[in-house]
UniProtKB/Swiss-Prot annotation:
Coiled coil: none annotated. A motif ('HIGH' region) lies at residues 68-78. Catalyzes the attachment of isoleucine to tRNA(Ile). As IleRS can inadvertently accommodate and process structurally similar amino acids such as valine, to avoid such errors it has two additional distinct tRNA(Ile)-dependent editing activities. One activity is designated as 'pretransfer' editing and involves the hydrolysis of activated Val-AMP. The other activity is designated 'posttransfer' editing and involves deacylation of mischarged Val-tRNA(Ile). This is Isoleucine--tRNA ligase. ATP binds at K628. Transmembrane segments: none annotated. Belongs to the class-I aminoacyl-tRNA synthetase family. IleS type 1 subfamily. Its cofactor is Zn(2+). L-isoleucyl-5'-AMP binds at E584. Its EC number is 6.1.1.5. Its main location: cytoplasm. It is found in: Cytoplasm. The keyword Endoplasmic reticulum does not apply.
Length: 968
């Protein structure tokens, strides 16, 4: 087969103006820095970004916003969280549900207090009263809220921005006081002296949620020998029966027998009041190579021989129960203390099996101390400095010089068996990044024990996404202790309690609570610092106001945010309680999810949410946590607006940021970085270019005038609508299940594989070359108009700006002024024809196989465009033959020709094999032969036809193109 050249001497005419080329104002580039704010202003002016959700007639959908902390610049964690919420809200609005998203901010707490103090010099600090500090903190928080709000809005987040909730608002603070009051009335609030997590660096108690456990912490681990002073008779008898006789004299007994303990907090040894054992364990009296007996758990003897480098041989073994009542001497202080029975926390996993017990410095120690009436000793002040109760160690700091000093003293007394560093998880203050301690103080607690079972029941009523969240929350609530809710800080909601000035009585009752709540409702929590006891107490107590002093503690910030269901969701118009959904990072199982659950269950015996969805953390491309020191911080503002070097950090716009959020499996930690952003931007461009192609080919199309009924469309168009229906169904399911990565995958495949590479690739000829109003062109435009409207709707929860831009650039009129007023895209049943799926699958497989052979020819320089080729096919599979018959019998002759679908100039199915071949391939599907197409290239449609040159008016055109021009 040969290809002819154009006749010599023929003047070439440009036929570009006779083609139906793209016409659209929808840009190839997004110009996001200008266009996105314009679209956001359009939504605002048209009442789309708020009123649309408020005015919907469907069921209420409340996604309650977990308040971010009002401090610092927005980061990728904010972006992941807020965009996920916005995608869900926009989808629900499109589904016709009533949505009012109220954004919130957590405004109290130490970080803001510290920020205020950092900006003051020493003189200003000294002049700072608590009330002045609060005023400055409130101003700082509000400024941070304004800054963060502007960032959220730039991301295209829809919310009731004019009415956010801030935990510093007086109505919020009053609702929080009411939550506290109701819990108090139910007996769930109490004051007690208990060991709590204490931060010497912040000088306040901390809740579990305010702790972090950084890698790399080591503590000084010591094995210590406590000399025995007196044995209970039952124990002495049991030892005698085993042939072990011990001295009666206390001094001699102490030299002969010593109790071995292990601790990683040597600084707590001055507070030791007992040694605890497990009554069920076996304990050995083991002689070492110095002739001394050490009391240790029998099971640990082999490991202790290695650890202590001692020859330890058991002389006698008894159950732990027999050790109760053994008296020992403190190795550093003049104090005798007993061995007592502890609990199941005493194991043989580490240490010696005997536990140094300081009730003032540990929860298990405290509980054991309560059980055995050991008393309380906590010789450490709020800064971590040892008090006079620590004897010779007074003045030492427990996190600095106390440990080495005490270890040296133990060694000097001969009581130190071993000293080595020990790496383990240790709690740090999440704000100051410094170690915490356990310290017994008078604090206010919420008695979780009082409603633990109800909380566990409530957890089971919630749908947790992912499902593992249920087990995580159950374990935390089942194992947690009572909640320490008091803080020794100024910037917060006051614990509304009065203390007797001369005695120990506490004044807190329904009357005082109601009075304080009324004052805060009117004036805000500052009133607690602005007024004296005469005004803060109810009138009935005014006469004895001098007897009382107001408390200075504030509430844990987790109690603040944990009251949001009461202050916001259950109070404000357009919201619902229990809410449909809470959505935050996975760290909130021990934070906001839990504090909200506890307060809601305590008061109303139900969870505040029906669903809880968690996401992971944003990491760099190597899976590392972002930090300034590593230089791997990805700034969402730079993603949107670009960096200093815009070639290296181009301005991608908010939609690319949003598309990234949709692309990740957020149930785990998610990576983000320059190369990932380039990939996401590439997908964005493909979706945009596909949309632009659809819009550009509709410039002369009016659906009312030009559309063809769907049942009358050619097979190719009907299949494309059937495929669109499938994709829309799958996208709807993905959104319903919050599986946005499935949306991302479906969108990419639909735009690239189904539309660009197949349907639109085939459609170019009939779109460009046909007469403008020709049926083969109008049928394609009909399908394209139906597709672009649904594509715009389907992407609108994620690519909200692009979707609206598409809608504003539709070249024909539609009833709705915004894509969001159209609602969630649906497809008529006339689009659905599952019988097309099997034959179309075969034909697409055939097209892919032919393209591979053509590509091989191109790579070898034997072919340029596919239209230079002629192809002969021979079907091998029955399924393909049936598909070819189906296409031939049911296809539209002007559109559904296999030659046009393969984009070649000539096609032969069956018949004799060709002689002059460029390539030939046999596979299970078919025999594919490729040769050069006969004829010459038409200057207008680029097909190779044998009739080119036969038309004197247009000597470089094929007969088809001549016919089109003559018709025009």
């Amino acid at each position: 087969m040969t290809q002819g050249k154009q006749p010599d001497g023929v003047a070439r005419t440009s036929y570009k103006d006779t083609l139906n080329l793209l016409q659209t104002s929808f840009g190839m580039r997004a110009n996001a820095s200008q266009r996105e704010p314009e679209l956001q202003e359009f939504w605002k002016q048209q009442g789309i970004d708020l009123e649309l959700g408020l005015n919907n007639q469907g069921q209420n959908f409340t996604l309650h916003d977990g308040p971010p902390y009002a401090n610092g610049a927005l980061h990728m964690g904010h972006a992941l969280n807020k965009v996920l919420k916005d995608i869900i809200n926009k989808h629900q609005i499109l589904r016709g549900r009533q949505v009012r998203f109220v954004p919130g901010w957590d405004c109290h707490g130490l970080p803001i207090e510290l920020k205020v103090l950092q900006n003051l010099n020493q003189e200003q600090r000294e002049a700072l009263t608590p009330l002045k500090l609060r005023k400055k903190a409130a101003a700082f928080a509000r400024k941070q809220v304004d800054s963060q709000m502007a960032g959220f809005r730039r991301w295209g987040i829809w919310a009731d921005w004019e009415h956010p909730y801030l935990t510093l608002q007086k109505e919020y603070e009053a609702a929080q006081i009411q939550v506290f009051g109701k819990m108090f009335q139910k007996g769930y609030i109490y004051r007690g002296l208990k060991p709590v997590h204490w931060s010497p660096s912040s000088r306040t108690a901390l809740a579990e949620a305010e702790l972090e456990y950084p890698d790399g912490h080591t503590s000084p681990s010591v094995y210590v020998a406590f000399p025995a002073a007196k044995l209970p008779e039952k124990l002495r008898t049991s030892l005698g029966n085993q042939g072990l006789e011990l001295p009666n004299n206390g001094l001699e007994l102490g030299q002969a027998l010593q109790i071995a303990i292990w601790t990683t907090t040597p600084w707590t040894l001055p507070a030791n009041l007992a040694v605890s054992v497990n009554e069920k364990l076996d304990y050995s009296f083991a002689v070492d190579n110095q002739g001394r007996l050490l009391l240790v758990a029998a099971e640990l003897l082999p490991s202790l021989r290695d650890t202590l480098a001692l020859e330890l041989t058991a002389r006698a073994t008894v159950k732990g129960a027999l050790l109760a009542g053994l008296i020992y001497k403190h190795p550093l202080l003049d104090r005798d203390s007993p061995i007592v029975i502890g609990g199941e926390y005493i194991t043989t996993e580490s240490g010696t099996g005997l536990v140094h017990t300081a009730p003032g410095h540990g929860v298990d120690d405290f509980n054991t101390g309560q059980k055995h009436d050991l008393g309380m000793l906590c010789p450490v002040d709020e800064s971590g400095t040892m008090t006079s109760e620590a004897g010779p160690f007074a003045g030492l700091n427990v996190l600095k010089d106390a440990n080495p000093t005490i270890i040296a003293a133990l060694e000097e007394r001969g009581a130190l068996l071993k000293h080595e560093p020990y790496a383990h998880r240790y709690p740090y203050d999440w704000r100051t990044k410094k170690p915490t301690i356990f310290r017994a103080t008078e604090q206010w607690f919420a008695s979780v024990e009082g409603f633990r079972n109800e909380a566990l029941t409530a957890i089971n009523s919630v749908e947790w996404l992912p499902a593992s969240g249920r087990n995580r929350m159950e374990a935390m609530v089942r194992e947690r202790g009572d909640w320490c809710i008091s803080r020794q800080r100024t910037w917060g909601v006051p614990i509304p309690v009065f203390y007797e000035r001369e005695g120990n009585e506490v004044l807190l009752n329904d009357e005082t609570l109601a009075h304080v709540k009324a004052l805060i409702t009117e004036h805000g929590a500052d009133v607690w610092w602005e007024r004296n006891e005469v005004e803060l107490l109810p009138p009935a107590y005014a006469a004895e106001a001098e007897r009382w002093r107001k408390g200075t503690d504030t509430m844990d910030v987790w109690f603040d945010s944990g009251s949001s269901w009461a202050a916001v969701a259950s109070q404000q118009e357009g919201l619902a309680y229990p809410t449909e959904l809470y959505l935050e990072g996975s760290d909130q199982h021990r934070g906001w999810f839990q504090s909200s659950l506890l307060t809601s269950v305590a008061i109303n015996s139900q969870a505040p949410y029906r669903q809880v969805l968690t996401h992971g953390f944003a990491l760099d491309e190597k899976g590392r946590k972002m930090s300034k020191s590593l230089g791997n911080v990805v700034d969402p503002a730079v993603i949107i607006d670009g960096g200093k070097n815009q070639k290296q950090e181009p301005p991608y716009g908010a939609d690319v940021l949003r598309l990234w959020v949709s692309s990740v499996d957020y149930s785990a930690d998610v990576p983000i970085g320059a190369s990932i952003l380039r990939q996401i931007a590439d997908v964005y461009r493909k979706v945009r270019n596909t949309s632009r192609y659809l819009l550009g080919n509709l410039h002369d199309f009016d659906p009312e005038r030009d559309a063809i009924p769907v049942p009358e469309l050619p097979l190719l168009d009907r299949w494309m609508l059937q495929r669109t229906a499938e994709v829309m169904d799958e996208i709807s399911t993905a959104f319903d299940r919050y599986e946005f990565y499935r949306f991302f995958q479906l969108l990419q495949s639909y735009c690239v594989v189904d539309l660009s590479n197949f349907y639109l690739d085939i459609a170019k000829d009939r779109l460009y070359v046909s007469s403008p109003s020709e049926r083969r062109r109008r049928s394609c435009q009909t399908a394209m108009a139906l597709i672009i409207e649904r594509l715009a709707g389907a992407i609108s929860p994620v690519l909200c700006h692009m979707a609206e831009d598409i809608w504003q650039n539709l070249p024909y009129s539609v009833a709705e002024d915004s894509v969001f007023r159209r609602g969630w895209p649906t497809v008529p049943e006339t689009w659905r024809d599952p019988s097309m799926m099997a034959p179309m699958h075969q034909l697409r497989e055939l097209r892919s196989a032919v393209n591979r052979v053509l590509e091989d020819c191109r790579s070898q320089g034997e072919l340029g465009a596919a239209l230079e080729a002629a192809v002969r096919l021979e079907a091998h599979s029955e399924a393909l033959q049936e598909a070819l018959d189906w296409l031939r019998q049911q296809g539209d002759p002007d559109v559904d020709g296999l030659r046009d679908w393969l984009l070649v100039s000539h096609l032969q199915v069956g018949g004799e094999p060709w002689a002059e071949l460029l390539a030939s391939q046999d596979n299970a599907l078919a025999t594919i032969e490729v040769a050069r197409a006969r004829g010459s290239k038409c200057e207008r449609c680029w097909h190779y036809e044998t009739d080119v040159g036969q038309h004197t008016t247009h000597p470089t055109l094929c007969g088809r193109c001549v016919g089109v021009l003559e018709h025009q």
